């Protein structure tokens, strides 16, 4: 069976120097190829919502990005503000420093505060797997499952590494068959996307969506 890669893709542009013209082009590509969503920083949500109005492509905003180290109240506020501006999905970054400090209850409360402000809006929780042990990956996946989060997500694409097959498999095994798993960071071609899907990913975050659906080789850099 042929994989419909477009339906997996969150077409993504998160660079700090991304221009409005580049964001508009991103939206045009997403509509042309019928990608699942466009994922941007929250400041560009109003532009994306306007560009995607009337299309099937969803508006996704990152929150607390890329460090995840801000105040919980700020993350919760940003999520609510992004939703008010038109975001239909939210991707938040956990506080990795708290996790590595053993402040597990605080990490969980941080996620819960954002999830509560999301209400019915699907929340994806970014683990930054390249910085975590397998035990820590399982720990966060379990708390996300307990909090009824929609997705767990591998990476920001801004740290020391992106999605790895073994991490996606571990995340899928931990959360079970129903919850979403998003592979992001360094997924730049069809072969890598297929590897992640076979490992259990139900969404792919990438700036190389056009290359993936067309079977071409993307640039070596990018999300």
UniProtKB/Swiss-Prot annotation:
Query: Which terms are listed as keywords in the entry?
Result: Cytoplasm, Lyase, Schiff base
Which EC numbers characterise this protein's activity in its record?
4.1.2.4
> What one GO molecular function would you report for this record?
deoxyribose-phosphate aldolase activity
List the active site.
91, 153, 182
Which SUPFAM superfamilies does its entry note?
Aldolase
Question: Keyword Lyase on this protein?
Answer: yes
Hey, which pathway is this one from?
Answer: Carbohydrate degradation; 2-deoxy-D-ribose 1-phosphate degradation; D-glyceraldehyde 3-phosphate and acetaldehyde from 2-deoxy-alpha-D-ribose 1-phosphate: step 2/2
Q: Where in the cell is it found?
A: Cytoplasm
| Enzyme type, top EC level | lyase
Recorded catalytic reaction(s): these are: 2-deoxy-D-ribose 5-phosphate = D-glyceraldehyde 3-phosphate + acetaldehyde
Instruction: Give a Gene Ontology cellular component term annotated to this protein.
Output: cytoplasm
Alphabetized Pfam families for the sequence:
DeoC
Q: Which InterPro entries match?
A: Aldolase_TIM, DeoC, DeoC/FbaB/LacD_aldolase, DeoC_typeI
Q: Name one GO biological process term.
A: deoxyribonucleotide catabolic process
Q: Is the keyword Cell wall biogenesis/degradation assigned to this protein?
A: no
- Tell me where it mainly resides: cytoplasm
Q: What the protein does? A: Catalyzes a reversible aldol reaction between acetaldehyde and D-glyceraldehyde 3-phosphate to generate 2-deoxy-D-ribose 5-phosphate.
Query: Which family would the database say this protein is a member of?
Result: Belongs to the DeoC/FbaB aldolase family. DeoC type 1 subfamily.
Designated name of the protein: Deoxyribose-phosphate aldolase
